[in-house]
Amino acid sequence: MPIFTLNTNIKATDVPSDFLSSTSALVGNILSKPGSYVAVHINTDQQLSFGGSTKPAAFGTLMSIGGIEPSRNRDHSAKLFDHLNKKLGIPKNRMYIHFVNLNGDDVGWNGTTF
């Protein structure tokens, strides 16, 4: 049930048409989760400042039940930053990604919890 949320000040018109599908595939791959459980949400056109500048930037959160752990987050970070830089043109030094490991009992789905 990975959820990747990205807040960015880039315009919606600058997001490639395949961004959601390619990001979903990447998240499923790096976390070894089925694509049918992956959710991706991008909030564009945000009023956002990074380092005192409003040049292109982003703040993201990757949440998952499992797969998020200190020994793997550096690799997750490298792959996500490469992807976001390539797809959206945001410099790697103008993004933060917060990794959150969730307990299945704290996540609702289909009328129950995991």
Swiss-Prot record:
Membrane-spanning ranges: none
Residue numbers annotated as active site: P2 (proton acceptor)
Induction and repression of expression: Inhibited by free fatty acids and haematin.
Protein location: Secreted
Cellular component aspect of the GO annotation: extracellular space
Residue sites binding substrate per the record: K33, I65
Catalytic activity as recorded in UniProt: L-dopachrome = 5,6-dihydroxyindole-2-carboxylate; 3-phenylpyruvate = enol-phenylpyruvate
Full protein name: Macrophage migration inhibitory factor homolog
Organism ancestry: Eukaryota, Metazoa, Ecdysozoa, Nematoda, Enoplea
